[in-house]
Amino acid sequence: MGPEFEDSIPLVHSDNRTTTIYSVYIIISDIFSFVQWLLFKVLNLIIIDSPAFVLRLLSKNFEINLHLSSILATLIGVSVVTYLVIRYKFLTGYSHSNDQKEGAGKKGIHPASSKVFVGKSKQDKKPSNYLDEFLLAIKVFGYLDKAVFHELTKSMTTQKLSHEEILCLDESLGFSIVVEGVAQVYTKKSKENSSKYKQRYFEEIEEERDEFLILGDKQYQLLNEVKSGAPLSSLFSTLDLFRPRNKNEEMALTPNDEDGNSVVALNMDYLSKSEPATDSKLSNSDDDENGQDYPEIIVRPKKSHNNGTITIAIIPHTAFERVQSKYPKATSHIVTMVLTRLYKVTMSTVQNYLGLTSEILKSEIKLNEENATSLPRYFVDGLLERLNKKEEAEAEAENLPKKLKHHHRNQLQRTTSRYVSLDSKVKSNHPGDLLSSVPISRSEFQKKVLPKSSTTSLSDGDNKRMNFTDEMEETEENSLRVAIIENIFKMVGIEETNGIVERTGYFQSLSSSTSSSIVGLDSLNQSIMSGATTPTTKRSHPVFNNQGSLMNTINLAELRKPSTAENSTLPKLSGKKRLLSDMNIKDAFAKSLEIKYIGPDSTIVSQNSAITGLYYVIDGSLEIYNRSADVSAPNRYIYTVESGGIAGYLTSVVGFRSMVTIKTPKKTGAVVAYIPKNDYNKLLDKYYFLQLPVALKLKNLLSKQILTIDYALEWCHIPAGEVLCSQGDLANGFHVVLSGRFRVVRSTNKNTEKEDVEVLGEYGHGESIGEVEVLTASRRSNTLIAVRDSETARIPRSLFEMLSNENPSIMVSVSRLVASKVLASQYQPRERNFITSTTSQESFTSANYKTITILPTVSGLPVRQFAEKLVQALRQIGRNVIALDQASILTHLGRHAFDESLARLKLSGYFAYLEEEYETIVYICDTPVQSNWTSTCISQGDCILLLADAEDDSTTIGEYEQLLVKLKTTARTDLCLLHQDKVVRAGSTSPWLKNRIWVQGHHHIQMKFEQGANVLPHKKSFISDLAAKLSQNKAIKSTFEATKQHIKWYVKENDQSKVLKIYKDDFMRLARILSNEAVGLVLGGGGSRGISHVGVVTSLERHGIPVDIIGGTSIGSFVGGLYAKEYNIVSIYAMAKKFSKRISSVWRMLFDLTYPVTSYITGYEFNRGIWKVFGFAEIEDFWIKYFCNSANITNSTMDIHEKGYAWRFIRASMSLAGLLPPIAFNGCMLLDGGYLDNLPVNEMKKRGVKHIIAVDVGSVDDRTPMNYGDTLSGFWVLLNRWNPFSSHPNIPTMMDIQMRLTYVSSVNALEEAKRTPGVYYLRPPIDPYATLDFGKFDEIYKVGLKYADDLFADWKSKGKFPRIAGLVEKKKDGEEKKILYRRNSI
């Protein structure tokens, strides 16, 4: 490349740069020139061309010719278009806000979840091995500790029976439990009932029927079928198993194998020798002619289960003896469980259901006949003398002389009886011993008479108070108290098992238990102890097929070794220590003793009273009376407790309510010694080793029939959500609800893919279930699901039939119970009518909740304040109620009430006791969400009240609700929205209910409270920000404060009636609804005649009658909706009059006319009239619970509306066919509900309302007889109408016949409503008024007001006024008095 070319390169680059710059310059200059030209043109157009165009236009002449008709047509067209735009675009805004699915009842928890529960099988959670079955059965002992449980199970043996074997149940050998298969338990019938079977032999066993079994010449009847996991032995049999046995008893239990040639002879020989020394549980031996004793109870496998075999686990009696020695506290727990089952299951069922109270009372009669022990005469004389002197002193002070009547006195002098010296004190004394009761100086006695041979002494820690009143001399009164306690001890059986008590005390001191007292009242302890430690040989029992043993071999020698070693080191307690321990116990009991005189014809204890105790009769007598379940029945005399006897024994020992009334004779009084039941229970808890002998004594006193019932009854524990019995199951028994609640569910459409579940109702405490199916031998018609943890007493069908044969009165009482249920069901709402009612799922009867839980949605809500107001309201309506919170439970049961298993058992027992004592229990959830008490409250509630702040804009799910959902409770849950004022913002309720499918209902409650810090603040808005800025202006602020003060003064002056409106209290309303004491108001349809409803409602307020639930039809739905929304008669009157004026306007109706294809009018003016009153308010926003009905002509059903826009469904309920078009909703056409039920009393009754005030304003049904032949001429009908002298009534027209046809079902429903119990039927005299006479508002209103005022005044004068809870206070004697409210006079 040459140098010339290289020099030319910079020149080329310079030319290119110059060309580019020039091009840019040209473009910019062109743009600038275009802008100048455009600007010039615009200015030219504005300044020159436009004015010139205007001048040319104005210089021309225009001429427009319009005819008058054209002008009018144009104006009419514009007016019509404007009207249509405004009418259908702007004035129908209320109709466009109905996109949500209104009126569709929420499904809630119970219908949806019940289906899931119905699908559960009771065998789903069936244990799969022996240990699980055993654990399930051992729960009857009450959550034993692991050490005690291991002590019982380590000696357990099992035995398997084939279908050809029969087991002779010997409860003295041990405690038996079925761990596999189903066992049939038979009991021997009496000789009289089985005499016709004497010619049959043992081999002739009837296999055609399982109810009876022939064994030799004895007949056995089926008592019960015991399934796997259930105990085969009676819980009462454990009492005998705890008692140590001597050598003779052990040898008596050993069978003799010598006579092994004959199977029957071997078995009979065994049976004759295997009878325990004590009375067996069902022992009532029936000897035949050969002297052979047949067993009272036999067991055989059920052939249709587990291939006809069963496996039984047996805990030998030695295991129980070791538990009693090592763990005496556990023994007392088991005894407590035995007594708990006795009073909760057996006695409760026998008294309240079977009506065998006399059988229970026989034990107390037997006690007084066999064991009554009177005091020495000098004790009684001295006591009467002191009481006489006391009465004389009181009479002199009050100037009212009184004298006690008493018997002749013994001539013994007090000084003589006071200082008698007895050497017999050295010997062991017995309660009731006359000589041992003589008062002497105790200090001298301790120095002289204690034996010197005592070699073992107690430790310093165990050596407590050794005398009665420290070192003070014992007075005669103290001696009297000790003598009384000794007699009571003897009667209740404490002296009979001193060996057990003494050994219990020793091991108790080793384990450092709560008490180290040792009772030694008998010198037989050493022989009992020696007998208990004697080893025994193995036992083997022959069976019927001679191929195996009746029970597995139990090596008693090996089982006795630990006990023998322990007992060998047991130091013998000296007589001194035994006596001192005896004094300590007597000391404690004597201190709680009250001695008093009761005058003639005085009632000491009333029947069913829980405040009772032990009454020892010192002088005089007490009469015992009993009254049947009928309150009007008189008291029936039972027996008399003479001097030395005890009254109130069963009530104190078992803990049951008093089954009798205890009175003194009409002419003479009585001197009694009284130990309150609470003090008695506390002392037995302290000296818990006394519980076993007391329970053994009670067992020996009970009759065979009661023990048989106790054996066969089942104590069923059903966890929450589990199925008690399923639809279609065999009815092999019926249940009595002891505690808890059950929901009745019925499944329909089983053959279809979608199975419907219908909730029929609920069963609560004390109600019985399933008698009809048992009596008719049919299958279960319903499924029962436990709402919460529940307990029932199951009465097997076989037991019921056996008792009915022996006591026909049982069948009579149960038949009456079933008949009363059938009779009551006639007045209950029909489940299925010929017209299906699509009732909301939340409207089933929620009768009488036993337990109510108050649970907040979030922390910071006034739970305690709400609970206090609710409890006060419940008490005011006459309920016996108690409120429980965590503090009260911890105070009663200790700080470990929710931690330990045994403590939880006590907790459940305490809750069950409270359910017996109180009508309503309120659980207050005042603890954090993680607390055990919160979970306990949720699980214990029959009804859960969920508190929420209605003014809180945040409607999210709170932490307490999350726990509620997590626990999967099936209890009814109601949302309580708390308002500061009695105002509900339209549409503010539905957001709370929208996402809470577990809520079945809601209540609006006014309660002033301060919002907690945890409650979320309200959302900010533009208006609030503007108000905040304006409040900074001083002038505006001062004006605002002045106006606010004026408004407060005005409200105060014009709201003086609040004090008188106690009947409007929201907590009283809530209390009545929860207690089945609600008052319902049902307003019927009738067009303008329904204006009288306003007058009736005004009269209700004047007379202070509360209204808790409102229902209505047609015009009744309108007036009822107004009252439910406003709850203020002034507002109702004004709005009803406004609506009537609008509807009665002729011009409005004329403008609403349309071509009468479906209806005469479009319904626009009618809709606007209703909407002007209710606006966008929803039924959920109404302050009072409300519902209305409509006729669904698409599905041919009656629809009940409880949610959705109020105006829409009230309009549907008022849609008269022909006049108004039907309301279209979800594709269905809704018409006036009066066509199906013009007075929906039946629907109100389904909501559990007790008092229903039904106001009927419908037209009178014309029932004039017609007789015009088989043919009818229309001309004759026309002439008959025109003929004033015709004797024939006017024949109805086609329109009249069609109208009557549509109201056929409504007329029948009205007649049924009049006959419904609890309905107060009102019909004002409004017949002269037509259906559309809305222009006569004031006249019709006054007719209704005057009628209601006169009727209510007449009711009050004649005593027919409804006894509404809260308005009438119940006295103790059953009388009632009207509650007067204080006037606001200042």
From Swiss-Prot:
A motif (GXGXXG) lies at residues 1085-1090. The chain crosses the membrane at residues 20-40, 66-86. It catalyses: a 1-acyl-sn-glycero-3-phosphocholine + H2O = sn-glycerol 3-phosphocholine + a fatty acid + H(+). A nucleoside 3',5'-cyclic phosphate 1 binds at residues 577-701. Pfam families: cNMP_binding (PF00027), NTE_Ploop (PF24179), Patatin (PF01734). Intracellular phospholipase B that catalyzes the double deacylation of phosphatidylcholine (PC) to glycerophosphocholine (GroPCho). Plays an important role in membrane lipid homeostasis. Responsible for the rapid PC turnover in response to inositol, elevated temperatures, or when choline is present in the growth medium. A motif (GXSXG) lies at residues 1112-1116. It comes from Candida albicans (strain SC5314 / ATCC MYA-2876). Its main location: endoplasmic reticulum. Belongs to the NTE family. The keyword Transferase does not apply. Inhibited by organophosphorus esters. This is Lysophospholipase NTE1. A motif (DGA/G) lies at residues 1232-1234. Residues 402-411 have a biased composition (Basic residues). GO terms for cellular component: endoplasmic reticulum; endoplasmic reticulum membrane. Residues 394-416 are annotated as: Disordered. InterPro entries: Acyl_Trfase/lysoPLipase, cNMP-bd_dom, cNMP-bd_dom_sf, NTE, NTE1_P-loop_dom, PNPLA_dom, RmlC-like_jellyroll. It comes from the Eukaryota.
